[in-house]
């Protein structure tokens, strides 16, 4: 079956037209969604930019614009309105050629594309193909965003547009980070390591280079806005806020007999051999006198190891110049595309879970909140002692929630299969806690012994909704599963009155109901029964004028009749009325326990616990159905909503047990009976 790209390309060829993307049109809102700039963008196709002679393409190049030139250096600049963090990420991607072709398919040209280009990006837990047309925003005839300086290669400008399309607009990229870019482009888990505070040592770098991860470093000194929006260079030639890739380490013996630890870095903006147009000017650079300290043999050996754009510097200079390392951990499948990673001895194995924080169901907030236990709970079973990298990614690019995660150890005697309850978290200290931040990604590196661990991904505040992906990478054996609560009845939610109470109006609750008998008899028929409309009148007359009065509505009355009517007459007796009223008082007592801050208003995230006290243990899916049916716009429930939910559940369980002929939690039901049961709820 042809892909969407193939269908569009075939259609454009048959009609001999250039494609216009209907999902990301050439309009102002595709550039700035929230802000309104004081000018209008003109959208131009790449070939039109070249034909206009306006200087929109590289002025110092006579070459015609192309999509991709494999021999060209990476010479992309952000333009007047582009983002330097994204340029840095694209520079790193371009230095990893096989991973580059995963994102930027090479079989595309400006001449044969008919205006449609495709890219592959890691988005919301999977690789997705993104299609864009080649209309780019310009100001006064010049490209407003990413553009080449001399090469006239436009893959970067079109890839930037594809990323903007995923985010909703170019403006949304203003809030992006290098971690976001590296994740989207490489599909890995990004971990930031401050070099000084993390006490980075040569051994740390060596261990990283034995695994399938890409190690980058950057000097994030405060940068000033440079001329022509070029990245700022430090006096030693190092670009500020640009990712340099760590290639290798080596030790060199000087003529004086001492050893110097060297670090090899790749300048992603250069593809020249060592000594030719090398930007780094410090010790061990081509013209440095430091080379006089080593023999010609050692010099030749070290230079032989350098690839295009690579250079040596001492480890001491490394930790002084660079302030942060950004490590991209890649799983085995992705790393196998890159030859230098494929041959490394340790490969990261990845397990992934995709979930959702849903208000009232799984959005419990961080461990500061009493609803923390309703968050998704993931069981990590570690077979071998090993390092693990845990990453939480929310599927929200604009206005992300504050997110993080907490982990607990589980050393119980039995294998955990159901969610841990609130008491567990009250009585146990967490094993680890990530930082919380309003970022798309939060990651944590830890060393775990063999055992079982429960991971709780959360938003910081309860009731905040978002989809998320949890990825866990390890070098050994481990399993990841989602814990779930089994749906069952723990207590009878609608107990019948004891026979003595029913006959003699015994007990305070029953006595208070018996006082309504005269009103009941006025409404009852000759058989002393009432229907839902008469029950409505009775409740209107009997219930006090507080929040319980809301239960006097026709919908609840219909539910009460359906719950207790076994004959199909649509009527109930006074004894059945008493049973309902006694249980209503009990339900109100439970409701009050969970609405102490504001009487009569139950926050949705407390519904699960309140229903558990009534007698229901419910799975996440069933809680989701209940919340969708009964939650109000402000994220709360009133007593009438709560009572309706309790009756609804009681009826559903009763209908199931009527059809259960011995099989555990399984029934076989005829279509007629199934429809009847559904309508009875």
Swiss-Prot record:
One of its GO terms (cellular component) is cytoplasm. Localized to the salivary glands in the larva. Residues 482-514 are annotated as: Linker. Its main location: cytoplasm. GO terms for molecular function: calcium ion binding. Keywords: Calcium, Cytoplasm, Metal-binding. Ca(2+) binds at residues 565, 567, 569, 571. It comes from the Eukaryota. This is Calpain-C. It comes from Drosophila melanogaster. The gene is CalpC.
